[in-house]
Each structure stands twice: as C-alpha cells, then as structure tokens.
Amino acid sequence: MTSLEDSIKVEVKTEYIEGQSSPTEERYLFRYTITIVNLGEKAVTLKSRYWSITDANNHNSEVRGEGVVGETPTIEPDSAYQYTSGTVLETPLGVMQGSYTMITGEGESFKAQIPPFRLAVPGMLH
C-alpha cells in the first residue's frame, strides 16, 4: 500500500424500503450496508464520519458525526467492519458519498474516502 488512505476499502450495498416510504409525501427511505475493509498493516479506529447526500432535485445535505451507529470500531489488519444505516430522500433517486476519519494506534489520522453510490427506487434506472 502506498498510503494509509489506500489501505481502507469501502464497499456499499443499498436497498429501497418500500414499506416505510411514501412517494405521495415525497418520502423515500433507503437502507445502506457499509463494509469497511482494512487491507493495511496497522489497526485503525473509525473516529468520525462525513456524508454528502444529494437528491434528484440537486438538494444537498451534509451529515457529520462521531463514529457510526453509535460505535467507534477498531478494525484490525485483514479484517472488516460492517454496519447498516439509512437515509430519507424527497426524490426516488439520489447519491451519497463521503469519508471516514480514521486513526492508527500511533495517532496518525487520515481520511478514508467513501466512493459515490446511488440510491434508487427499483425501475427508476434502466
């Protein structure tokens, strides 16, 4: 690995939650499952998160906070951490992206990028 940033791989799976959504009220609920894989040689702790969420109307919201789902997990080398969370959009289509602030046991801080991923009601895109 060339850098600490390259040592973290973020994988995302999304799901539209139809039963808790209400299109007539412009409420579309999506669940996302994130897997954070530590490909590096050092254990890292996830300290905080940053999300940029954009819907189909180009409305952008930003979310910052400590940890994820109430935890600040430490991810050992060649290990992964997975969690599930959700978000509500006013449109049936949107994009999320962001970063995690990570720290090594030696106190080195870095940002692990979360690549853009699509939130879409099934059938919205061909």
Curated annotation (Swiss-Prot):
InterPro entries: ApaG_domain (IPR007474), ApaG_sf (IPR036767), Uncharacterised_ApaG (IPR023065)
GO BP of this protein: error-free translesion synthesis
Disulfide bridge partners, by residue number: none
Pfam families per the UniProt record, alphabetical: DUF525
Domain ApaG: start-end pairs: 2-126
Domain of life: Bacteria
PANTHER family: F-BOX ONLY PROTEIN 3, POLYMERASE DELTA-INTERACTING PROTEIN 2
Protein name as annotated: Protein ApaG
Species per Swiss-Prot/TrEMBL record: Shewanella sediminis (strain HAW-EB3)
Name of the encoding gene: apaG
